Amino acid sequence: MLDERAKMLLKTLVERYIADGQPVGSRTLSKTSGLELSPATIRNVMSDLEELGLIASPHTSAGRIPTARGYRLFVDSMLTSRAFAREVADTGSAPLLQPDQPKRVIANAAQLLSSLSQFVGVVTVPKKPSVFRHMEFLRLGERRVLLILVSPDGDVQNRVLFTAHDYTQSQLVEATNYLNAHYAGLSIEGVRERLKLEVDALRGEIGTLMQAAVQAGTEAVNEDTEQLIVSGERNLLGVQDFGSDMGSIRKMFDLFEQKTQLLRLLDGSSRADGVRIYIGGESGVVPIEELSVVSAPYEVDGQVVGTLGVIGPTRMAYERMIQIVDITSRLVGNALSQKQG
């Protein structure tokens, strides 16, 4: 357990290092901590903090820098809240405040997180079943039919079907009316199962067309399963902490390209109550010691449907990132709830 003096020195050291990116020495702490302590006394306290694994000494400097464990103690017990909502509101958040297509809201959110943090913004796409609200067939020409799929939230997808039979427009209207009367509101898979039972009762050509529509709908859903939107990866190239460490840079870009590990981490964060912070490799999922993740779930009508966050160096302004993530999660939830309403 640290005494108040040690806590204050650790807090000051972390804040100075976050601000400057340079190892912090005892003289700097003596001037900025507000404690009337000699540099010698401060050196003794720093030695104790180092033994506890809270700070470390780079080989090239007499100063100290925080470790992941030191950052964790700082985040858990030393942050203070400051007003930040107006900066978010005044920095391009307007698109998020408007009900819009979910894809556009999610893309805007990732860009907003990246813009405000100057790091990487990530947002998982809302989880939803592959339900359709309306389906329509239009004749394009001989043996070519346009299938229009409309989801409950207004997303529209078009697919061209190449058919073995040349359907008239009246046949297509008949199939459209039947599908919408009997299957609207079901998932694509639900429609498939119902058709298996009912296809014999339908005229052969119409049944075949409906089966083709279900197959096209399945393909459309599978193509539209991008689960994670990432924005601002290149921002990390300008972070001095990574310097010319090509190994770390390569790992980072593999992480953003493959997305699997990030999705596992963010899915775990969806069960958190508010903002959650992973420092360095402590998540066990993102295997990069130099990266931290600040994340929070977002809700639609009281139900958690996704997670968003900021990914940056362990030397980040955690207080600021927490508020960026917290406020953005609320903006996204509001925009999506209004859209569904």
Curated annotation (Swiss-Prot):
Pfam families: HrcA, HrcA_DNA-bdg. SUPFAM superfamilies: GAF domain-like, Winged helix' DNA-binding domain. Keywords: Repressor, Stress response, Transcription, Transcription regulation. The lineage of its organism: Bacteria, Pseudomonadati, Pseudomonadota, Betaproteobacteria, Burkholderiales. Belongs to the HrcA family. GO terms for biological process: negative regulation of DNA-templated transcription. This is Heat-inducible transcription repressor HrcA. Negative regulator of class I heat shock genes (grpE-dnaK-dnaJ and groELS operons). Prevents heat-shock induction of these operons. NCBIfam families: hrcA (TIGR00331). It comes from Leptothrix cholodnii (strain ATCC 51168 / LMG 8142 / SP-6) (Leptothrix discophora (strain SP-6)).
